Structure formats: C-alpha cells, structure tokens
C-alpha cells in the first residue's frame, strides 16, 4: 500500500468586483487529504472514505456525494479513459477539515484541491495542475450546485486567477504583488453559499455593469503593476456586496474598521460571512484584522471570530 498526503489552502472568491471570475489563495489555513492505495481487487466504488475529522459530522461519507472523493472518482475516470492508465485497486480517503464550513473561505474547493493533488501524485502525475482544475470545478457543483471556478482554480494553482471564459475554460494566472497581504476574518456564524447566491439579482443595470467592469480591469492592472493604491480603489462591488452585506451582522462597521486601520480595501470573502482586507504590509494587515475582529465583537450579535494574516499563496495545492 502507498499513502500520499495533499494540502490546499483557503481561497477568497469574487475579490469584491470579480464576481465568479476572480479569486486568490492564501497560505493558511487549509484542508488535508490522505489517500491510501491498495492493489487488492475491490467490488463497488473504487474510492471509499475512511474518516472525516473537523466537520462536526456534517459532511457525507458517500463517496459520490462528498466533494473530496467525488473529484477523485472523476480524476480516475479521466485518466483511465483519456490517458489509458490502469486504475485497478482501491483508494481509501481520509479528510482532515481545518476550514470552517459555509464560511466564504473556499472550504469545499480546498478539500477537492487537496484530494486531487494527492491523487495525481499517487498515480504518477498523469495530469497537469491546469487539468486538475476541471475536476475541482465539478466538485463545486456537488458542494453548492454551481460549477464556479473562483475558489477551485486558485486552490489548485495558487496566486490570483482570472476566469476569462467558462466554455471553454480559459484561466489566467496573475502573480501577486510582493508586499500584498490579506487579512481574513471569519465570524462564528454560517452563511450557506446557496442562500447567499439566491439573494443576488438576475439582471443589473448598464450603469452598474460599467462600474463593475471598470473596477475589475483596474484591479487586474493594479495587481500586474504593483500599484497598491489602485488595488485598494478597485475593491468596489456594486453587484453582490449590496445584497449580501445585510446577511452579515456588523458588515459595514467591520469594513469601516479595516479601512480606518489602514487597509487598502475590504469586502466580503466569497459569499460570506468571512470578510477580507488587503494591506501593503504585514503590520498593517495585522492591525486591520484585529480591528475587524473588534468590530464583529461590538456588533449586535457580539460575534467572536478567527483571524488569519497571510501573503498570497503562489504554490497552490501541494504534497506534504
């Protein structure tokens, strides 16, 4: 038998103005997946889940309904059909969750990415990281009913990732500015992605579309030129944030606290309830994160929270 341990970190989707087309990875926290392969013949599903920890018993053990095992099944099917690789034997999967569920931190994407990194290593690296993204996206469909890539792609590839097109999938990896730091604060409450998506408008005005496009373009330009002030000015979302902000207790105060502490900009992480802020130094990022935590605690619900300060992860999913 052979075992491989994969790891993938938290990600932030949307990045304010880039709804469903932009995301980035941080260095920690993240999920771990341990895959163990045996050559013995096994009837039934070729992948089984041996254990899940850190989820409070909420995640399914059915390998076809769990994101981490589902993507491994898709991966095995692909390399058998398109790469002509022998996939006999059985794979046992152990999932160690370190990311909170329904948090806006890319929890399902991290599990899928860690599982795919381990599976690819276990089977001799038959796929590129870019190929693995396709399977991770299908995992998002299982997790929340929508096959979006703004968490899945950076979980696999690291950096910032821009999704130019979904059909066909066209991803652009954008390396982060050297001094860009993220403060990520997760209040102790859940907000299901499916519900957070249900409050969004199905149509937007041309005026709002123009503002959103301008900010997306400016944000990408700011990242590519290390123009930190431009990055901050571009973190403006006129589409999703106005609808989702009321779902997060104390959001306005938390955002204001981050900006007053010196952050470049601040917005909702993915569908929430976590909130992220960008800063141009680790010191400012820590100050912004602490200010955000205090604001959550001062909100009507007196929410406690967890906080991480991190540079942007350049590596993506990896083997431990």
Swiss-Prot record:
The keyword Transcription does not apply. GO terms for cellular component: cytoplasm. It catalyses: L-homoserine + ATP = O-phospho-L-homoserine + ADP + H(+). Belongs to the GHMP kinase family. Homoserine kinase subfamily. It comes from the Bacteria. NCBIfam families: PRK01212.1-4, thrB. ATP binds at residues 100-110. Pathway: Amino-acid biosynthesis; L-threonine biosynthesis; L-threonine from L-aspartate: step 4/5. It is an enzyme of class 2 (transferase). Pfam families: GHMP_kinases_C (PF08544), GHMP_kinases_N (PF00288). Its EC number is 2.7.1.39. The gene is thrB. Its main location: cytoplasm. The keyword Cytoplasm applies. This is Homoserine kinase. One of its GO terms (biological process) is threonine biosynthetic process. Catalyzes the ATP-dependent phosphorylation of L-homoserine to L-homoserine phosphate. GO terms for molecular function: ATP binding; homoserine kinase activity. InterPro entries: GHMP_kinase_C_dom, GHMP_kinase_C_sf, GHMP_kinase_N_dom, GHMP_knse_ATP-bd_CS, Homoserine_kinase, Ribosomal_Su5_D2-typ_SF, Ribsml_uS5_D2-typ_fold_subgr.
